[in-house]
Amino acid sequence: KEAASIAASAPLESELRALVDGDVFLSIDNLCAGYGKMEILHDYSLRIGQGQSLCLIGPNGAGKSTVLHSIFGFTNIFSGSIKVDGKDVTRLTPSQKLSEAGIAYILQDKSVFPQMTVEENLLMGGFLKDKPVEAKAAAEMVFEKYSRLADRRNKPAGVLSGGERRLLEISRALVMQPKVLLVDEPSIGLEPRFIDMVFEILDDLQRKDGKTIIMVEQNAKKGLAFADIGYVLVSGETAIADAGDKLLENPDVGRLFL
């Protein structure tokens, strides 16, 4: 009820736009989406610029993961649109979103195959490449970037630490060289020291590689400290939108989510 009380006046499109640095790269407009016939998101809108990061926070069941699922094509879209770099991608399949629009989805914990080697897990990220040699070349670029994976490339992924497994999950998405990373609960199930490592990796991907990152994170304090933009979702709608550091200072957000 308290969360609903702060959602009385949803931010205007102009307010969402004001948080974007430069041109809008990915936009959602008046999206109604859900699962089966159940609508979870109601006239939902979002704006983010290229190379920016956005963190979605809110109570359980607010629709945070549904936003990521809708962008990637895992939900039923009843109305509204999703655009990337001016291209309408609303009705593309997940594989088309990855190969044509450069959108990669990084799953929650436990998507690594423990019996397969680190390299085999990584190569699975390139399954949409036209030629196996292209996936191999992209995987080598990942190994050059992350020595802790390169050192274990021929070992079963099951021997990796929790933080290294999360690094492998992120790296597998990089094989398709995406522009947009959808990251679902990067800190889930990790010890604090590995959480810091994962956020450092994501920060590097944004700052140095120019990736656009949209994240759902239950650790709201960590997510908002990382992100340029923060949205608070309540009942399938954005209740508050502001710069990440401003939301950290917002007393309502602090009382309810931090």
Say what each PLM segment does.
Residues 1-32:
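ABC-family P-loop ATPase nucleotide-binding domain
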Residues 156-160:
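Conserved ABC ATPase signature
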Residues 196-210:
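Helical segment within the ABC ATPase nucleotide-binding domain
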Residues 72:
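Helix-to-loop junction immediately C-terminal to a conserved catalytic motif
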Residues 173-174:
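ABC ATPase C-loop
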Residues 57-59:
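The feature captures the beta-strand-to-loop junction immediately N-terminal to the Walker
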Residues 80-88, 99-101, 134-139, 144, ...:
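Conserved ABC transporter NBD signature motif
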Residues 36, 76, 118-137, 145-147, ...:
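ABC-type ATPase nucleotide-binding domains, specifically the catalytic core motifs of the NBD
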